[in-house]
């Protein structure tokens, strides 16, 4: 059982954020606020969500994309991070797992995920 002050603090951190509903297999576009010196800029990161873990303020998710020369790039983001400007769901993926770590071993067409039909 958590302390009531910690619960109040966490609720205050969560209430201002508008996080879309997404799960593993979805293709996301993240707008990340990057501070370089005294300037800030927005950098986009687009990839497949391969895992979500935790709950509350400490919830995180892993996004994987194929970078230059087919090098896989994975980044872990806290969902309620101040540096995340926005999260956009581009495609819903049809997967049967909650953790898609097997995509690390796949290349090219084998790494594709079917789109969820509505």
Curated annotation (Swiss-Prot):
Keywords: Ribonucleoprotein, Ribosomal protein. It comes from the Bacteria. GO terms for molecular function: structural constituent of ribosome. InterPro entries: Ribosomal_bL19, Ribosomal_bL19_CS, Ribosomal_bL19_sf, Translation_prot_SH3-like_sf. GO terms for cellular component: cytosolic large ribosomal subunit. PROSITE patterns: RIBOSOMAL_L19. One of its GO terms (biological process) is translation. This protein is located at the 30S-50S ribosomal subunit interface and may play a role in the structure and function of the aminoacyl-tRNA binding site. Belongs to the bacterial ribosomal protein bL19 family. This is Large ribosomal subunit protein bL19.
């Amino acid at each position: 059982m958590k302390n009531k002050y910690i619960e109040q603090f966490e609720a205050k951190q969560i209430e201002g954020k508008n996080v879309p509903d997404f799960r593993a297999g979805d293709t996301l576009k993240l707008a990340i606020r990057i501070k370089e010196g005294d300037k800030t800029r927005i950098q986009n990161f687009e990839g497949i969500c391969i895992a979500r873990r935790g709950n509350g303020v400490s919830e995180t998710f892993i996004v994987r994309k194929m970078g230059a020369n087919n090098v896989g790039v994975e980044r872990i983001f806290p969902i309620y991070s101040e540096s995340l400007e926005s999260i956009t769901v581009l495609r819903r993926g049809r997967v049967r797992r909650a953790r898609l770590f097997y995509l690390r071993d796949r290349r090219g067409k084998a790494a594709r995920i079917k789109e969820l039909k509505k």
